[in-house]
Amino acid sequence: MAASAKRKQEEKHLKMLRDMTGLPHNRKCFDCDQRGPTYVNMTVGSFVCTSCSGSLRGLNPPHRVKSISMTTFTQQEIEFLQKHGNEVCKQIWLGLFDDRSSAIPDFRDPQKVKEFLQEKYEKKRWYVPPEQAKVVASVHASISGSSASSTSSTPEVKPLKSLLGDSAPALHLNKGTPSQSPVVGRSQAQQQEKKQFDLLSDLGSDIFAAPAPQSTATANFANFAHFNSHAAQNSANADFANFDAFGQSSGSSNFGGFPTASHSSFQPQTTGGSAGSVNANFAHFDNFPKSSSADFGTFNTSQSHQTASAVSKVSANKAGLQTTDKYAALANLDNIFSAGQGGDQGSGFGTTGKAPVGSVVSVPSQSSASSDKYAALAELDSVFSSAATSSNAYTSTSNASSNVFGTVPVGASAQTQPASSSVPAPFGATPSTNPFVAAAGPSVASSTNPFQTNARGATAATFGTASMSMPAGFGTPAPYSLPTSFSGSFQQPAFPAQAAFPQQTAFSQQPNGAGFAAFGQTKPVVTPFGQVGAAGVSSNPFMTGAPTGQFPTGSSSTNPFL
């Protein structure tokens, strides 16, 4: 029965201790202000934490510390704790402590904590006796309360007259009476502030000036109907991307037919009749001369007259032009090629005509304004129309040659006939001014020409080159006429005994003597039994053994394309 009563008494004391621990000033450690004290300092009657309880045991004299949850308390101890506590201990042991003058140590450093506790309990630096503790506490409370009220309360507002006296002059802050109400003034201030940010209308104006009327630029802002309504426009931008102004330049007045401002864009401009237009047949290849294999010897005198008239029209048109077109030479070439040239009697390509040369010579343009970078092309016109002395195979008369391929006379040599001093070389084997024919000198080599009966000819003659065993030219008469595929003249062979294999003609010679209508292939040479063929004689007309001298090699041409 006594044990149960004692147990009930201990439970009652523990409950009272827990209630004291729940008080506001006992919720923190008295020495370090840590929350949740777990020990009780029975020497002074304060609630402390676990770390501070160990430090208090190391003081001299040591403090008696008890755990709140693991020990039992007597009735006297509970009453002592009720009379004391952290609030009363603060008034006694920290009665003279000033927070402004005394520094609170860092409680994370154990050495500083120990020094602070020694100053507090052993030296009693801030100790106040219990009988005076309440008085000192009340005084500190009054001092702290008055200072707090003086700093927190606003001083009483006194009139200025009481400070300056009755003799102080009256102070007028605003002499003028406001003409507008404050509401109106505030609205104007807002309008002026809004006007400062209106950067599009009044960017450079005075921000305090009266609002100016809205300018036309602001009125038409983002109005695309007035986009091109400016009074004055730049003349350079007026014709921007206007290709009508392209035709105003004098340099492009001929090529492509760019019109002037009065013409519609990109329409060919006419400089006269349709036949006299410079660019009428430009790049029109239907008027180009046909292949020479199809129209051998078909040129006539009327075509040369037509060519002369066309060239004269070209010269007449070019005389009226003030500037030189850089493509005028090509246009003249087209007119020259479109009209065929020929002679009375054609001998191969060396056709001679009796057309007047004066009109052809007058082709070069007059008063060219600037140097043309295609001057070489411009000279082709004069090259094609220049006169060359040629010997006709039938008439032996010297005429002004208007041949397109520029036949030049061939000088007499030891291989040619003494009677024919100048032989028209059909393919231009001698140096020529024709840009389409390159000159090639005869090379001395063993000939394997299928049209040659003598294998020991002196020269491997090229086309149109007279030799001892090669026809001197197409349609050229000779005293020794042998049956060949080209019906040409053969010179007296140096070795008549070896000319045992005559060649058969595929087609007979044309009676009019105007060339050859078709090329015939020679038949294979039949070698009789028991005889050895001559060296170098080939029966295949396409398999020649000596490639030298078969085609023109050297060139003295002025053609820029070769």
Swiss-Prot record:
Pfam families the record matches: ArfGap
Main function: Required for vesicle docking or fusion during acrosome biogenesis. May play a role in RNA trafficking or localization.
Subunit structure: Interacts with EPS15R and EPS15. Interacts with FCHO1.
Organism, as annotated: Bos taurus
Keywords: Cytoplasmic vesicle, Developmental protein, Differentiation, DNA-binding, Glycoprotein, Metal-binding, Nucleus, Phosphoprotein, Repeat, Spermatogenesis, Transport, Zinc, Zinc-finger
Sequence positions bearing Phosphoserine: S167, S181, S362
Post-translational modification: O-glycosylated.
GO cellular component, one term: nucleus
Keyword Disulfide bond: no
Free-text note regarding domains: Contains FG repeats.
InterPro entries: Arf-GAP_FG-repeat_protein, ARFGAP/RecO, ArfGAP_dom, ArfGAP_dom_sf
Domain Arf-GAP: 11-135
Location of region: Disordered: 168-194
Entries under SMART domains matching the protein: ArfGap
Modification Phosphothreonine, positions: T177
Keyword Transcription: no
Compositionally biased spans, kind Polar residues: 176-191
SUPFAM superfamilies in the record: ArfGap/RecO-like zinc finger (SSF57863)
The protein's name: Arf-GAP domain and FG repeat-containing protein 1
